[in-house]
Amino acid sequence: MTNLPQGWEVKKLEEIANIKGGKRLPKGENLLDNNTKFTYIRVADFQDNGTINLQNIKFINENTYNVLKNYKIYDDNLYISIAGTIGKSGIIPKELNGAILTENAVKLEYIQNNISNKFMYFFTLSNIFKTQIQTSTKIVAQPKLAITRLKQIQIPLPPLKEQERIVGILDESFAKIDESIKILEQNLLNLDELMQSALQKAFNPLKDNAKENYKLPQSWEWKSLEEISENISAGGDKPKNCTESKTAKNQIPVYANGVNNNGLVGYTDKATIIKPSLTISARGTIGFVCIRKEPYFPIVRLISLIPCENILCLHYLYFCLNFFIAKGEGSSIPQLTIPKFKSLQIPLPPLKEQEQIAKHLDFVFEKTKALKELYTKELKDYEELKQSLLNKAFKGEL
């Protein structure tokens, strides 16, 4: 922190504020859902936008409040989390003035009246602050930032009038950026709805409201996966000769039920599934579906399905399972068993129509995927713009 403008100083946090930790509940006491008027603020209540989520706020009884009353936080204090999620910060809303603060956070009580609380909040969002707390954080089972180390954090501090000018610029700029981010996030939600709508139209073209075995067009019929598959099997044990990378001998991919890298965990020398097929995770991320066109070796918790090619299009089934399993039971069952999977009923149109449906869904999903990538990149760009503004602000260049 050099070459700061005239009138700026570099101060340690302990030089400008008393940093006080919160307090855990006394042994045997529990948080309450009913409003006792005595609020207890947890790190779980800290929102990303620098305030407190009031939707699931917890309370304590009056006796507990009296025991903890020395650990109150006020609306002119800044809070910072020091355990678990380190460095999450914000300003207490007026309706929570005087609430009790968790032991996993601290409050800043300013020693002098020449400090803007909002300026300090923006500082805690900056990489200048984040880099310092990362080097000061003790990495254990639950990351912890000691108050003694937090006190040593350095901040570039201009006169109060300049702090307020900087806050005004950042407030206005961040408001515009946040509005753009909000639009992009809504666009992403709209894309998800578009994909679900496309699947709904594809597999329930008559828009029947029945939950199961709804009415189908003429020439369509309900079929179990067992009826339209050449083989459905569960993966075996991981091969003993499995290697992380391809070798001269090991060229066959080994797949598990993971999502990362489409479940690839290594390579072996023999395939147990030769024909084009589909895999679906039976545990963990239930219902994660992949098309496998090359020979491979599936291992435990991964189900493989080889379709009867004369009646079932592999790409059609891919989209169908994404609709019926991922949308339906995927998140609510502990595991997907072979008998349950075999008995799953899907709507089956003639093969040519399956191919047309799959081609249309491919087009829709490719377009939405491209838009998702674009919107996600734009979101990242906006976050980088925020950091750029903060970086300039605390170098005195704004």
What annotation goes with each model-predicted range?
Residues 66-67, 139, 214, 267, ...:
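Short, solvent-exposed loop/turn positions at domain surfaces
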Residues 389-398:
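Acidic, low-complexity, intrinsically disordered peripheral segments
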Residues 6-9, 82-85, 98-106, 115-118, ...:
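A short glycine-rich beta-alpha junction/loop motif
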Residues 47-59, 78-81, 85-102, 118-122, ...:
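Short, ligand-facing micro-motifs at secondary-structure edges
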Residues 176-183, 190-191:
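Contiguous mid-protein beta-loop-alpha structural module that forms a pocket-lining wall or clamp
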Residues 1-24, 152-167, 187, 197, ...:
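Non-catalytic DNA-recognition/assembly elements of restriction-modification systems
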Residues 14-30, 45-75, 95, 226-275, ...:
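Sequence-specific dsDNA recognition surfaces
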Residues 170, 191-199, 361, 382-387:
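Short amphipathic alpha-helical coiled-coil/interface segments
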